[in-house]
Amino acid sequence: MEKNPPDDTGPVHVPLGHIVANEKWRGSQLAQEMQGKIKLIFEDGLTPDFYLSNRCCILYVTEADLVAGNGYRKRLVRVRNSNNLKGIVVVEKTRMSEQYFPALQKFTVLDLGMVLLPVASQMEASCLVIQLVQEQTKEPSKNPLLGKKRALLLSEPSLLRTVQQIPGVGKVKAPLLLQKFPSIQQLSNASIGELEQVVGQAVAQQIHAFFTQPR
């Protein structure tokens, strides 16, 4: 996997309703959870972990990747710098990896401007990936990954659950925030003043600190 071809972030043909998966995921729990619900095509030499379409991919950061250090960053940067791809970063946020999450969050959301979705396990990740593929089968104008106005579809349930985890937000305020800021990227870039209009000053400061202050 070290000697990737120069065009390994280029467009890959993905049949409708399929996922093209990096060969390294063959036999994994994540792949097994998806098989039977979605059709997987395994290919070697890919920088992304999964292609949802020829121009939309998932970069998966495992608990082990996060604990091991910053080795995952090179892959994220390659996809971010590619003109061919829109990348979504999915990360395993567990008790073991939680302390490393803020650094990943800052790098992914603030430095690279990419969407970051934490999951608790590969089983939860499989549900998220399947949901994203189902959205890909819709016409492009209704695809939440291609249109900001439809981004709220992604919040059922994965993005919504992610926002609920932000200190001070909870189940009541999360939907209100997502109506005004329908993606993690938009929410993380919001000013305290903009957030105050939705959730009040105290919670706005908590949200802003969550995204901007590394722990």
UniProtKB/Swiss-Prot annotation:
GO terms for molecular function: chromatin binding; DNA binding. The keyword rRNA-binding does not apply. InterPro entries: DisA/LigA_HHH, FAAP24, PND, RuvA_2-like. One of its GO terms (cellular component) is cytosol. One of its GO terms (biological process) is interstrand cross-link repair. Keywords: DNA damage, DNA repair, DNA-binding, Nucleus. The keyword DNA-binding applies. Belongs to the multisubunit FA complex composed of FANCA, FANCB, FANCC, FANCE, FANCF, FANCG, FANCL/PHF9, FANCM and FAAP24. Interacts with FANCM. The C-terminal region is distantly related to RuvA domain 2, a DNA-binding domain. Plays a role in DNA repair through recruitment of the FA core complex to damaged DNA. Regulates FANCD2 monoubiquitination upon DNA damage. Induces chromosomal instability as well as hypersensitivity to DNA cross-linking agents, when repressed. Targets FANCM/FAAP24 complex to the DNA, preferentially to single strand DNA. This is Fanconi anemia core complex-associated protein 24. The lineage of its organism: Eukaryota, Metazoa, Chordata, Craniata, Vertebrata. The gene is FAAP24.
